[in-house]
């Protein structure tokens, strides 16, 4: 039976962290040839004066970007809140801008920079002229119907099937990249210098190209929608906001040190085709997990969409780019190939695509971002959502989207009642769904309709917001719509963060690892996790590889259970971007109960054909291949080989495939050297670490990512009022900490008296996790939010 689907994330038209691609579907060939004042207590910061030297910073090990060998000789220390750490040299601290400071001391004459910028812009303008001349061939012919582009255009940026493009911003970003190449050539920079971002700063005369600071109110009780002003320091107000670039654990492997993707083996030959690797390493086999359910997989996708979204490059007119011939019989070459094309070649003997004459899978390189440093440098991919765990999937990452989702009554979000139960609001623009879908919804994220399970998790948190807003309005009838909306949002984000760090991560990374890193939260006590020097930026290695672990967890079907009928299996290949089944009676309760009971797939090398053959197939006999897209996207991002991250994580390098046993034999079938193995397949093939879902390399990378999401977030829900101007009272905090995902589900079930929910919502029901009536679950006591004196 076919296997998995999910955690789609980065796309090539949208990065996300689970599905990653920038894909325009091929035509079917016609023949086989074709802050408040209240009492509080705070976890005290330990005295570090005797532990670390003046030029060192005490931090959790994953925050220090040194590799494991260098970390091993660092002096131990105790961080806030009393977590074992290391004394990391401040120049190696990921949260500082040490590279920029060093670069500014090594900058060349301004005239060389100006010359490079001039020539870079001229080169970009020439490419645009070339694009105009060959637009008929370079652009997709099925827009706006082509699902693979349509679904990636963020809400509010669509106009008649085309994306609104800020031409000047795009010219600055790509002119900057071409200028960096020119500068590297003019100054004879080595590849190591380029990959280390040792470029010159931009002269003051033209620094209008640099990102300006965002004006902020450092005492705002509520976090902004777009993630700005989380860090109120003058030069850091844009840190972590939507559109900010990804960061990295290791330097990128751009072959020219600037933007050329990683395509060569260490032997000098070309790396194997991503599709060849997919076929050899990721077959379909039904292997259900014995403990965890589909809801764990689906929450993983929902969480990943909160901090990862990218889209592929488009023409200056906002049109999707085509990198394959119309019938996908070959990649485009020569004058017809757009400079942002990075298609996947399919061999003629492919066991599936050869039936349709497909020799090319379309993929366009991810759009780049203006970097925060006012300097030339290598390309940095744009993340189009906030870099925080702030439920942007519910509220959006821009003020325009947030406003569109609000009812502006009683603090509520918009909803709909097409079958008598509360569902998401109908989308004004149905291009996020297949044309034949009977309904299409709108949420805070453009991928809301991708999978039924994802749509229902969006529905769950929309319902929870509205439940909180209505409850607060009854307790505080004098509050206006804005206050009710912001307070309900503040509580929901806290509930969500509590679920992520205290229910989801202990399963994903292992309880021991979560405790060791200080990722688990205490009850009824404030913390001071916040580190203003740590940049809240999603790691490219997490978005482009590690958080795509979830593709292995996806089952090829959803099994819906009701008392009145036998189980119904709905195959994911038939319902991508089609949430029509939500219109059936009692759909919310039926689906949420079923997700609790159905096992997810095991974390292993087996992927459902629903993802590797039929991804977004619409009504065609074939779709795309998510495994191939993941591998190619990692190369687009210039993520370094798997071996480099093994070494960074302290596992040691592999020098012979035989060191990995059976897995090594599989890898040797497609790779020439252990140093060629791509990060995503290497990480997926690792056996799970003790107590974790994923292997040790992904545990290390995900730990680094989730440490940032907590320690670089001033508004993290357990931070006290000396840090967080929107801190909860201790009584409120304790109430939130006792909230569970099971309780949230029960609070929003339509028929609570008939709904049974196990306490551990991410695990299958069992003798140790028996479902009990929802009437036994307590909800958040909103009486603690009553404003006295009114």
UniProtKB/Swiss-Prot annotation:
This is Chorion peroxidase. Extremely resistant to denaturating agents, such as SDS and organic solvents. The active site is at residue 305. The record marks 447 as: Transition state stabilizer. Residues 17-209 form a propeptide. GO terms for biological process: egg chorion assembly; hydrogen peroxide catabolic process; hydrogen peroxide metabolic process; response to oxidative stress. Heme b binds at residue 551. InterPro entries: Haem_peroxidase_animal (IPR019791), Haem_peroxidase_sf (IPR010255), Haem_peroxidase_sf_animal (IPR037120). It catalyses: 2 a phenolic donor + H2O2 = 2 a phenolic radical donor + 2 H2O. Keywords: Acetylation, Cleavage on pair of basic residues, Disulfide bond, Glycoprotein, Heme, Hydrogen peroxide, Hydroxylation, Iron, Metal-binding, Oxidoreductase, Peroxidase, Secreted, Signal. It is found in: Secreted. The gene is pxt. The modification 3',4'-dihydroxyphenylalanine is found at residue 353.
